[in-house]
Swiss-Prot record:
This is Mitochondrial zinc maintenance protein 1, mitochondrial. The keyword Chaperone applies. GO terms for biological process: mitochondrial respiratory chain complex III assembly. Assembly factor required for Rieske Fe-S protein RIP1 incorporation into the cytochrome b-c1 (CIII) complex. Functions as a chaperone, binding to this subunit within the mitochondrial matrix and stabilizing it prior to its translocation and insertion into the late CIII dimeric intermediate within the mitochondrial inner membrane. Modulates the mitochondrial matrix zinc pool. The keyword Cell membrane does not apply. PANTHER family: COMPLEX III ASSEMBLY FACTOR LYRM7.
Length: 118
């Protein structure tokens, strides 16, 4: 596949990713697509090889699909999140592991600093 066809495929992938991430927010959708169009015309890192720029655009597209979730304010202080099938949901396993910070070992400001300078 030639570089130009790979770039076109990455650009289309990016446009689809913006639709997934910002589909219900027309203003953000237009801004994201405008920024992408500008980046294709004037690459932000011209010193990178075209293949690296294409890879970067594909990574940005993947990030948009998996990690951007839009929220809409409902009544009161409640928000509705637009979580879709491609949204990456963490399993929170890192929260369950014991932290190795000063506070969790009885040191730091709240623990009185016991054994801080052993």
């Amino acid at each position: 596949m030639s570089t130009s066809s790979m770039a076109l495929a990455a650009y289309r992938n990016g446009l689809r990713a913006t639709k997934v991430a910002f589909g219900q927010d027309l203003r953000m959708l237009q801004a994201a697509r405008s920024k992408m169009r500008e980046g294709m015309a004037n690459p932000p890192n011209p010193e990178l090889a075209p293949e690296q720029q294409i890879q970067h655009l594909n990574e940005v597209s993947q990030f948009l699909r998996r990690n951007i979730v839009q929220g809409k304010r409902g009544e009161g202080d409640k928000y509705t999140l637009n979580i879709h099938k491609e949204t990456e949901l963490g399993d929170n396993e890192t929260i369950k592991t014991t932290k190795k910070t000063l506070v969790s070992r009885g040191g730091g400001c709240c623990g009185g600093g016991q054994g801080l300078y052993k």
